[in-house]
């Protein structure tokens, strides 16, 4: 009897220990799953990843690229990210030639660019704001009026209900993605008559803000109180109106690669993993851009 009781006690103890062991394994697995989910949400972090990543292109994407660059390098201290702001056309040429890893473009890619093996990776949506100096009494235009201003048919603000003042039409240089998108969306490609063509978003913002009678266009995310953003067809340039499809002037922010993302090196793939993570998406929203639907 004593031997039987002893055997039962041993079996019970063993069963308890096995249950605890399996429970422990289950907890460890759940923890690993949770950690994996957390890692995916926060973006790829790899201290062993080392090397360099090069981007070039759109000046309109500077604010976004600098924010992503800083946060990505914090998570991946072994990687050096460099970005050159050379204009959308130049960025696409560079990635096509293989001289950079990623070409930044603030417009959709052309069929010819895609035919050269360049992949259009849309990372954000931006609005193009039409701006004037703060002393201008005209605060909204129809899209038809805007066309006529930039094609030279309307040259004085008095024709639009404003004061007798010459309109100074400011635009971007020919290779600019902002200009390409603006002219395409307005259907005035190669028809515009610019008083000045400037080579960066910041230059347009500064010139319009300091020039009486000036009008220009810039990325929505760089707007500040030095200029006034105009309503177009009665619609304000806001994220809500762009998402709702109400605002005419919106365009994609593209990080183009030569070939698909899964064909790229580990650093490029890690970059896009981060951009598409919850943390990366939060960075995109923080700089005033809209997430692709």
Label each residue range with its predicted role.
Residues 1-23:
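Sec-dependent bacterial lipoprotein signal peptides
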